[in-house]
């Protein structure tokens, strides 16, 4: 594993041809640079390390920063310190004069000497927008933007329209910085053959936080048939920044496609658009689900339903819970209701069920075979009895038993007490014992301390630390913990320093024994 402090994409005429576009990362802890290649992964990419083109056995060699240089090489800043931890820095235990700078370039490659771009005309700068050196391209963009010459706008628009590579993308940036990118021109560029131009024109127009009517409609149409995932990702990212009337329709269009079901970002980007408006514009978000066709979209089924239901239920306000009822009522199939209920169950896990509006209570009662844990949380006495049986049954999956312990413990801990005590005394699964201890800890009963202390020696190892915390949490139980240590049933090394601090807070009687 590594901790890269700086990463650049290599774009320089003095660098090896087969390095162009690859990533170069600075890893000061291992004292080397890492060369990596990129592979497309939907709207993003993955990397694979290829080599360490620069490495040094000198323990003070610390490459921390790199940059594509004006001459086409790569400059490397070496911090040159034996220790680079923060402790040395704020105590001024570093040498501010020892840093070094290296130049990295390919053998036999000429370094570029044409670096006075400020002396060039606008036309000359435009010719540099497809230069192999990243520094030249970016500097030309900056200078054209700073000059903001209206006469250059026409030439830049023409160049963007006729070029398809770097010259088109950098021309777009220059036109934008020079103030020459209007809505009409931006709309035309949505049909540009370079997907990065399409993505960037959407991003730049989105910086205004509201799109013109014509551009918005064009982007909406694009969202339906755009073939490049990076452009779709940018549409989703821009949709998040837009007002409800523009952001929600764009997200809805993307959610009706199946291209991005497995994309690492786009489904969540669409969800964030809905989530952003789910509080202040709840009705507009829920209105999307009045359309059964939208409900059945694979992107909606897999990535949205559970999250939206969970978000509404977690807030717990009456309007939000009414929204949960509306979703359940609109769900076209049991599978959709199950997705919604999975989110609802996660939202209420670990807390008492809030007062439910009549509409939601009605929908929950109408569910086909609702989960036992949910029925327990709804106060179903029969379900609680069934849950106690499952909790005590060692043949049932531990995960199911733990879920029911949490549900029953939030509803009626008094009825659960005897069952949990039995688990502490005989259960072998560490997760189940831990869950039982966490709920029993809420009950003020001296007998519980005796029961837990009596089994300290043979508790599952993963549950023993919880049992120790349990006994230390109350003064009346802490005596049993100290008895276990003094009798040798529990080793002193098992008592963490944090537990000792808790014991010392219980008063002199316990504190004296702790010492």
Language-model segment annotations:
Residues 77, 91-99, 104-515:
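Long, ordered, helix-rich scaffold segments
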Residues 1-124, 135, 145:
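Beta-propeller domains with acidic blade repeats across secreted/periplasmic ectodomains
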């Amino acid at each position: 594993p590594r901790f890269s402090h700086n990463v650049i994409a290599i774009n320089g005429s003095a660098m090896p041809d087969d390095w162009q576009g690859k990533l170069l990362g600075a890893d000061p802890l291992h004292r080397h640079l890492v060369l990596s290649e990129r592979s497309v992964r939907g709207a993003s990419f993955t990397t694979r390390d290829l080599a360490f083109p620069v490495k040094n056995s000198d323990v003070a060699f610390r490459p921390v920063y790199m940059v594509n240089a004006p001459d086409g090489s790569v400059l490397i800043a070496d911090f040159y310190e034996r220790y680079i931890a923060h402790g040395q820095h704020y105590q001024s235990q570093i040498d501010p004069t020892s840093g070094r700078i290296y130049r990295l370039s390919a053998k036999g490659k000429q370094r570029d000497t044409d670096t006075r771009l400020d002396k060039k005309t606008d036309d000359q700068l435009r010719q540099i927008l497809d230069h192999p050196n990243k520094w030249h391209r970016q500097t030309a963009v900056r200078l054209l933007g700073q000059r903001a010459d209206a006469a250059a706008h026409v030439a830049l628009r023409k160049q963007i329209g006729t070029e398809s590579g770097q010259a088109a993308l950098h021309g777009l940036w220059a036109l934008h910085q020079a103030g020459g990118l209007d809505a009409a021109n931006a709309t035309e560029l949505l049909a540009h053959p370079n997907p990065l131009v399409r993505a960037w024109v959407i991003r730049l127009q989105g910086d205004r936080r509201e799109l013109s009517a014509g551009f918005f409609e064009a982007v909406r149409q694009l969202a339906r048939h755009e073939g490049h995932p990076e452009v779709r990702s940018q549409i989703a990212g821009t949709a998040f920044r837009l007002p409800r009337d523009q952001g929600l329709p764009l997200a809805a269009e993307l959610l009706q496609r199946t291209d991005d079901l497995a994309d690492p970002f786009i489904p969540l980007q669409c969800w964030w658009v809905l989530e952003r408006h789910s509080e202040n514009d709840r009705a507009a978000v829920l209105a999307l689900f009045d359309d059964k066709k939208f409900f059945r979209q694979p992107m909606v089924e897999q990535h949205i339903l559970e999250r939206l239901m969970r978000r509404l239920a977690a807030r717990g306000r009456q309007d939000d819970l009414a929204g949960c009822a509306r979703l359940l009522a609109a769900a076209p199939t049991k599978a959709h209701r199950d997705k919604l209920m999975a989110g609802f169950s996660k939202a209420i896990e670990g807390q008492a069920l809030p007062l439910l509006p009549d509409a939601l209570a009605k929908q929950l009662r109408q569910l086909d075979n609702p989960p036992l844990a949910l029925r327990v949380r709804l106060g179903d006495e029969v379900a609680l009895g069934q849950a106690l049986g499952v909790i005590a049954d060692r043949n049932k999956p531990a995960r199911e038993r733990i879920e029911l312990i949490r549900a029953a413990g939030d509803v009626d801990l008094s009825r659960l007490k005897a069952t949990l005590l039995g688990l502490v005394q005989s259960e072998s699964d560490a997760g189940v014992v831990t869950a039982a201890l966490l709920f029993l800890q809420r009950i003020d009963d001296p007998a519980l301390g005796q029961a837990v202390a009596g089994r300290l020696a043979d508790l599952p190892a993963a549950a023993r630390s919880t049992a120790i915390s349990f006994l230390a949490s109350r003064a009346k139980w802490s005596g049993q913990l100290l008895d276990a240590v003094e009798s040798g049933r529990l080793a002193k090394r098992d008592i963490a320093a944090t537990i000792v601090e808790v014991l010392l807070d219980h008063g002199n009687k316990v504190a004296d024994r702790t010492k």
